[in-house]
């Protein structure tokens, strides 16, 4: 199965808030998105972690 589950971590408070899937064969670099962090209560950058 080429798609793997990834987790996104808030860059400010380091909480793991979101999960998603990605194809690691076509997208080798780590993703970064702006999403709403419930703990910070504002939009923050979220980076992909293992």
From Swiss-Prot:
Task: List this protein's GO terms for biological process.
Answer: translation
Annotated Gene Ontology MF terms? structural constituent of ribosome
What the entry lists under Pfam families is as follows: Ribosomal_L33
Superkingdom is: Bacteria
Q: Which UniProt keywords apply?
A: Ribonucleoprotein, Ribosomal protein
Q: Which PROSITE patterns match?
A: RIBOSOMAL_L33
Report the InterPro entries cross-referenced here.
Ribosomal_bL33, Ribosomal_bL33_CS, Ribosomal_bL33_sf, Ribosomal_zn-bd
Q: Name one GO cellular component term.
A: ribosome
Which protein family is named in the record? Belongs to the bacterial ribosomal protein bL33 family.
Name used for this protein in its record = Large ribosomal subunit protein bL33
Task: Provide the species name.
Answer: Solibacter usitatus (strain Ellin6076)
């Amino acid at each position: 199965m080429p798609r793997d589950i990834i987790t996104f971590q808030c860059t400010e408070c380091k909480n793991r808030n979101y999960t998603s899937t990605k194809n690691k064969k076509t997208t080798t670099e780590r993703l970064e998105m702006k999403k709403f962090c419930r703990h910070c209560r504002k939009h923050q950058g979220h980076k992909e972690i293992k």
